[in-house]
Amino acid sequence: MELFAIKGMPEIKPGDNIPYHIEKNIDLIDGDIILIASTIVSKSEGRAKNLSDFTPSERAESIAKSFESLANKPKDARLAQAILDESSEILIETPFILCRTHFGHICVNAGIDRSNTGSHDILLLPIDPSQSALGLKKQFSSNVSVIITDTCGRPFRYGQVGVAIGWAGISAHRDWRGKYDLKGNELEVTVQCILDELASAANLLMGEGDGG
């Protein structure tokens, strides 16, 4: 397996053709796997918003006040409302908001980003990352797979890693159940998440901060 970072990508704006910019900067062949940060997919889909777009509900105000009392720092109730709007379920409200997005991803703050947002305040995740991945896949001239990645924390582990939140043209998992180990013991529960392993590998090249 070889990994290549794509150089020369411009800052993506609403409506930009991401596959065009990728193919302009790297030669692709059938079977390649393209991993794309959710940040640029969201930007191309016009998911950058301002906090003024959100009117806090009573619940958002309550969450913001609870956070402020526990963390001893303010939380904008408009951001809390954006998180509520982007979530199908709130699992934990304080000391952080752990939620399930409408497409089933479990994450903090509905994956809303406050960095690399351009002239806007926040950047929401794509509405349906797997549909986004499928749409991107169809635009490439080669038969490639597409994985959309995001950075995510892990329970009881320090630091964040890249994970897959949408994909097209590739199997998500490798099922080892029914296979045997070196001692002849049958594997009963092992299902390998290929997508997240590839996302973490790609994140080593993507980096964080000013790479968005």
Question: What is the role of each PLM region?
Answer:
Residues 1-212:
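N-terminal and secondary-structure boundary signal
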